[in-house]
A protein has these predicted regions:
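Sec-dependent N-terminal signal peptides
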Residues: 4-12
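Catalytic loop of the DD-peptidase/beta-lactamase superfamily, centered on the K-T-G motif
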Residues: 20-64, 111, 217-218, 222, ...
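Extracellular Ig-like/FN3 beta-sandwich strand-entry sites
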Residues: 85, 442-444
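Short, surface-exposed loop or secondary-structure junction motifs
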Residues: 121-324, 329
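Aromatic-rich carbohydrate-binding modules that target alpha-glucans
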Residues: 385-441, 452-477
Length: 478
C-alpha cells in the first residue's frame, strides 16, 4: 500500500511539473539582452545593469556605457546610488529589533524618541512601530517639507532639493517634528514619507545605543558579505556618473540626517546577494520583513516595501529607488524563487515608468509558463450562463489568496465589483456563474482575473482566447 501511494505521489508530481514549461539559461540570457536593448532605447539611459537570481543561480550583465563615448561599461563592482532601496535595509534593522524583542510592533514610537512629542497622536491614538514601517504615520508633511518645491518641478529643481538637503540638520529635523500634525488616524492611510524613515533610524540608535551606520554594518553588510555597500563611502570609492534626459551630468544625493531613507551606495554584485537573501523564505528575518502586518485583504508594505501583492505567481515584493542621477527597481517573487534588480544611470520624469515596464516584462519572460493544452481558458458557456473559472497554482500558498474577481470591459474593469466576486470551490479553484444575457451577443468582451483586488493574473501562454499584444487580456464571445 505504501509503495502504491509513493508511485501515485510521484506520478502526480510529474504531472504537476509537466504543466510548467522550463525556462532555460539561454532563455534567461536572451530575455536580459532584449530588456536591456528596449530600456536603453526607451529610457535614453547610457547604461543599463541587470541582475537576476533564479532558483538559486545568479545572472548579471551590463550594457551601454556609463559616460557617452568613453566605452566605460559598468561591471559587478561598479558603485551606484541606490536611493530608496536603502529603506529595505532600514526595514531589516527594525525587523531584527522586533524579532529580538527589543521593540514591539504595537509600541508607541514616542517610547523610543528623545524628547516629548504630544503632537504625535491623533485623538488619543499614537503612532505605532507597525504604522511607522508601513508608511501609515499620518504625518501631514514630510521632513524636510518639499511640498512647495514639488509644485513647480522643472529641469533645475534638483538644485533646490540638493540645497535643502545640504542645509537640513538633525536639530532642524527635531524642531520640525514638534510641529508635525497628524491628518488622520495612524495606521489607516498610506502616505510615503522620507522623514518617517529618518525617524526610524533615530529610534534604532536609541534602541541599540549604536549608530545607524554601525547597525547596518554589523547586522546586514557583514552577515551578507556586502563588501561594496556603504552609507558614507570611502574617499577612494568612485560612484558611477548619472545623467538627466538632456545628458547633463547630475549631482549625487546629500543627506545630513541619518541617510536611512535613500543614502546607501551599492553594486550589482551586492544587490544580487541581497536578492538571494530576500528569496530565502525560511529565514525568519526575511519572512517577517515581508509579512502582511495589518492582515490586509489587498496589498501591503511589510517593512518599508513600496508594495507587496499576490498574483498568479504568488507573493511579489517591489521597491523603486530614484536619485538625481540614477534609478533602480527591485522585484522578488519568493514563491517562484525569482528576483531581479535593474539599474539605469538616468533619472527623469519618465524613467520610473520605463523601468517598471522593463522589469515586469522581464519577470513575465522568466516566470514559469503553464503548459496547458491549446484551448479556451477562463470560461465556458453552460446553458444560459457564462461560468468563469480560475485555478491558482497548487504549488503556491493558497492562503495568500483572499479573493478573486473577474474584471472586464463588460463591467468597467473594476477589480472590486462585488457582482463579479468569484466563489471559492476548493483550496485552489474559484468559480462564478453569470447570466449570459449580461453579455452582448457577437461582441468581443475582454477580461482578466484579479487576485486580492490588486494582482492582475496573466493569461496562460496556450490560451486560444488571448489577445495578441496589448495587455494580453482574455477574450469572451457569446
Amino acid at each position: 500500500m505504501k509503495k502504491y501511494l509513493l508511485v501515485l505521489f510521484m506520478i502526480s508530481a510529474l504531472i504537476c511539473h509537466a504543466q510548467q514549461k522550463t525556462v532555460t539559461e539561454k532563455d534567461v540570457l536572451l530575455a536580459m539582452d532584449k530588456t536591456a536593448s528596449d530600456l536603453l532605447k526607451n529610457s535614453k539611459a547610457n547604461s543599463v545593469s541587470i541582475g537576476i537570481v533564479k532558483e538559486g543561480k545568479t545572472y548579471t550583465n551590463h550594457y551601454g556605457e556609463i559616460d557617452k563615448g568613453k566605452g566605460n561599461t559598468a561591471n559587478n563592482n561598479t558603485v551606484f546610488e541606490i536611493a530608496s532601496i536603502t529603506k529595505l535595509f532600514t526595514g531589516l534593522l527594525v525587523t531584527q529589533a522586533v524579532l529580538e524583542k527589543k521593540i514591539s510592533l504595537d509600541d508607541d514610537i514616542r517610547k523610543y524618541i528623545t524628547g516629548t512629542y504630544p503632537n504625535l497622536e491623533y485623538q488619543g491614538t499614537p503612532i505605532t512601530i507597525r504604522d511607522l514601517v508601513s508608511f501609515k504615520t499620518a504625518f501631514n508633511k514630510d521632513l524636510p517639507d518639499t511640498a512647495e518645491l514639488r509644485k513647480n518641478f522643472n529641469d533645475t529643481s534638483y538644485l533646490a532639493f540638493k540645497k535643502l538637503a545640504e542645509s537640513y540638520s538633525r536639530e532642524k529635523f527635531f524642531a520640525d517634528l514638534k510641529n508635525i500634525q497628524l491628518d488622520t488616524l495612524p495606521g489607516t492611510k498610506f502616505k510615503y514619507s522620507n522623514g518617517s524613515i529618518q525617524l526610524t533610524a533615530h529610534i534604532l540608535e536609541n534602541v541599540y545605543q549604536k549608530s545607524y551606520e554601525t547597525l547596518l554594518k554589523e547586522k546586514i553588510f557583514n552577515k551578507l558579505g556586502l563588501n561594496a555597500t556603504q552609507l558614507n563611502v570611502s574617499k577612494d570609492v568612485i560612484i558611477a556618473n548619472g545623467y538627466n534626459a538632456k545628458n547633463i551630468l547630475m549631482p549625487k544625493l546629500s543627506d545630513n540626517l541619518w541617510g536611512a531613507a535613500g543614502y546607501l551606495k551599492s553594486s550589482l554584485g551586492d544587490l544580487v546577494k541581497f536578492i538571494t537573501f530576500e528569496l530565502d523564505t525560511k529565514n525568519k528575518i526575511v519572512a517577517e520583513s515581508q509579512r502582511n502586518l495589518y492582515n490586509s485583504n489587498t496589498s501591503w508594505n511589510g517593512y518599508f516595501w513600496d508594495y507587496i501583492m499576490v498574483d498568479n505567481n504568488g507573493q511579489n515584493c517591489r521597491k523603486h529607488g530614484g536619485a538625481f542621477s540614477t534609478q533602480n527597481m527591485m522585484i522578488v517573487y519568493p514563491e517562484r524563487k525569482l528576483g531581479i534588480s535593474v539599474i539605469v544611470n538616468i533619472s527623469d520624469k519618465n524613467t520610473s515608468e520605463e523601468l517598471e515596464k522593463a522589469i515586469i516584462n522581464l519577470s513575465t519572460a522568466l516566470l514559469p509558463k503553464s503548459d496547458l493544452p491549446k484551448e479556451i481558458y477562463g470560461y465556458k458557456v453552460q446553458n444560459d450562463n457564462v461560468v468563469f473559472t480560475y485555478k491558482h497554482d497548487k504549488g503556491l500558498n493558497s492562503d495568500l489568496v483572499k479573493s478573486v474577481n473577474v474584471a472586464g470591459s463588460f463591467e468597467g474593469w473594476n477589480p472590486r465589483d462585488k457582482n463579479y466576486l468569484m466563489i471559492k470551490k476548493d483550496q485552489a479553484t474559484y468559480e462564478l456563474s453569470v447570466p449570459k444575457s449580461r453579455f452582448e451577443k457577437d461582441k468581443t468582451h475582454l477580461f482578466k482575473f484579479v487576485i486580492n483586488s490588486t494582482g492582475w493574473a496573466e493569461a496562460p501562454e496556450n490560451a486560444t482566447n488571448k489577445e495578441n499584444g496589448g495587455d494580453n487580456n482574455l477574450i469572451l464571445k457569446i
